[in-house]
Amino acid sequence: MSAPDSNSGHAHDSAQNEGAAEGTRDPFGIDRLSVDYDYLLYRIQDHVTSIQLSTTEICRQQNQLVEQGIIGDAIDINIEEMRRILQKCEELETHFDMLDQIDSIVQTFRPRLDDIVREHRELTRNTERRI
């Protein structure tokens, strides 16, 4: 069997001694917590910067499309289509108003027709009695 490497044994011992010394210097792990906190802030800042760059690129692309007229044409087409739909809605509303007026007229005809039918029956009875 080979003898253990004297250097590796000492390195292991010194790491243990350093960890133990650190534990006595920072028993609550405040130093480690501070390092972790700083790293977390760095990662958050990195993520925010990444989002900012992506957003800036998307805005640049959209602006370029608007400048090229691609989106402008689509918007104009959509606006024109909406105007046509609104015009059809107004026409439908006019037709519904007409139907309401016709319904009102029909409602006034019913009592008048009932009166005419009643008068006709009376006249028919009176005419039959005379004959």
From Swiss-Prot:
Residues 73-101 form a coiled coil. The keyword Transport applies. It comes from the Eukaryota. GO terms for biological process: endosome organization. Its main location: cytoplasm. Belongs to the BLOC1S4 family. This is Biogenesis of lysosome-related organelles complex 1 subunit CNL1.
